[in-house]
């Protein structure tokens, strides 16, 4: 890195300068530099220590010209739990690129935790940089889609387009038949308005069968799905004798001017067995049909959950998402894609989706 440049860990005294930088480099995405969103994202995370944030900045004088930001999490690897970071954002001012800044910031981040995680695409150029720093591509995370109302999914607009859209939806009705009549094989689907001790008991009980998975305790889940500014998630739980056996988190895009919801995403799912997974996916599809959503998508790496998607009419599509890892512990587990349980909620895919609430 050039001698005129400095790279170091961020402190809260740098906040205004960093937000100004984010406003410049993400001029078309003002949410990135929104103070409320930034503070929720990096300061209100239950794992966060505000005096030791996993954010690193590059400076030219007092001007921020690059930054790497991560969020803290915990990951269960085998029988042990480790602190980790998910790298969410790495960007350099276009006038300061090719000066070694990105590599220096990655190096600082790697010293922070023994396990470092990221989800990237080749379009971002980050995979090549991270591989040069010793990171490994563990897997391409599969993407699954189910089309419910093709007109709503692919045809927007009013007038003649609305007629074509409605016709396409009607022609596809046979593909939706039967979903609403199915019920959980053992238990009851309920709305969850807040995660509580039931979710913690589910995690304690069911995490034992997963070898490589981000910890899903109620405090972190509430931060992510019920406290995020300007977003509403729908959470469905399967209960049996008042015991939570699994949950699924859905995110519906805001409706357009014609009241059409083009897409919904399954942001997260966690369950105790394959039957529960199947019941939760079916409940998610049923809710999407009620809202006349064009299509439901998800990115997910776990055989049992993927099998449940396939049995509920989802099909695999091309995915650009790459799970990348650099670990100083348990490489035999964390570098094996068959050991992982990963959903959209584990990466920035959910965090950076367009808000569906407007104030």
Sequence positions of predicted segments:
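Short loop segments at secondary-structure junctions
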Residues: 61-63, 95-96, 152, 241-242, ...
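Alpha-helix termination/capping residues and helix-transition junctions
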Residues: 111-112, 230, 242, 290
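A conserved beta-strand-loop-helix scaffold within acyl/acetyltransferase catalytic domains
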Residues: 5-90, 190-269
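Conserved acetyl-CoA-binding loop-helix of GNAT-fold acetyltransferases
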Residues: 89-111, 274-286
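Active-site/acyl-donor-binding loops of N-acyltransferases
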Residues: 2, 116-176, 224, 234, ...
